[in-house]
Amino acid sequence: MFALNKYLTRIKNQATWRYKRLKCNARNSSLAVEMTRELFYIKRQKFLCEKYGVSFDQVEKLNSDIIGLANNGIKKNTLDLARLAVKDVQQGMMYWLSIHGLTSREVKEMPQEKSLLDLFSYLLVVEGIFSKVVQIIAFMLMENDHDVFDSIRNEFITEFEELEKIDLAVKLKFLRKHGFLVLTDSVDRKLRNDIAHLNLAVKPDGKIIDKKSGTEIKNIVEKMDHIGCLCAISLLTLNYLLDEQEKKMKLTDAKT
C-alpha cells in the first residue's frame, strides 16, 4: 500500500510538473507572438521613417500618445466605430497612393500637370486620410471624458458623426491641447488653404507661385510624404491598439 501511494504521488507530481511546463510554454508562446506582432509593426514604422525621412523619436512619441488612449479602456461601441473608421482611412490611403504614384509615372515629363497633381494630392491627403486619422483620435479622446468644444457653433461635440461636420482646425486645436503635437504640427494649414482657395498659380515650367506675394512654393511633395508617412504610422499603431483591446474584451466575456 505504501509503495502504491508513493507511485501515485510520483505520477501526480510528474503530471503537475508537465502541466506547469505546458502552461509556461503556452504563456511564453503567447508572449512571443505578442512581441513578434509588436516588433513587426515597429519594424514597419522604422522602414517608413527611413524612406520618408521622419524622425523615429517623433514616432515613438506619437505611438505613446495613441497607446495612451486605452489607459482607461475602450468601450465596445467606440472600438467598433474606430475599427470602421480605420478601414475607411486604409481605403483612402490606397486612393491617395494611386494618385501620388500617377504624378511620378504618367506626368513626369509634363511639369505643369505634375505640379497641379501634386497640389491636388496634398489637398487630398490633408482633407482625406489625415483628417480621418485626426477624427479617430479626437473621438477616442472624447470617449475618455475629454470634451471637444466647437467655438464656431458654440457647443460641445458628443457624437462621432458630429466630429465630421466641424472644421479640421477645431480638431487640430483639440489634439494639440492633449499633446499630439507630432501629428498636428505636420500639416501646413496655410498651404492647404491656399490650394483650396486657388491662391496659387502653376507656371508652364511647373513652378508653383503664391499669387499675392509672388514667391515660389517649394517642397510640397516632401510635406505631403511626411503627412502620409505619419498617417500610415498612426494606422499601424491604431490597428495594434484596437486588436489588443478586442482581445481583452473577448477574455473578459469568456470569464463572465
Specify the residue positions occupied by each region the protein language model found.
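Extended intrinsically disordered or low-complexity regions, especially N/C-terminal cytosolic tails and loops
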Residues: 1-120, 186-187, 256
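Short, charged/polar, low-complexity loop and linker segments
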Residues: 106-110, 167-177, 212-214
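Intrinsically disordered or highly flexible coil/loop and linker segments, enriched in small
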Residues: 146, 197, 201-205, 233, ...
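Generic structural signal for well-ordered, non-transmembrane alpha-helical segments
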Residues: 53, 87, 124, 128-131, ...
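Histidine-centered, metal-coordinating catalytic motifs and their short helical/loop contexts
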Residues: 180-208
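Amphipathic, Lys/Arg-enriched alpha-helical patches that create a basic surface
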Residues: 207-256
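Flexible secondary-structure boundary motifs
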Residues: 119-185, 199
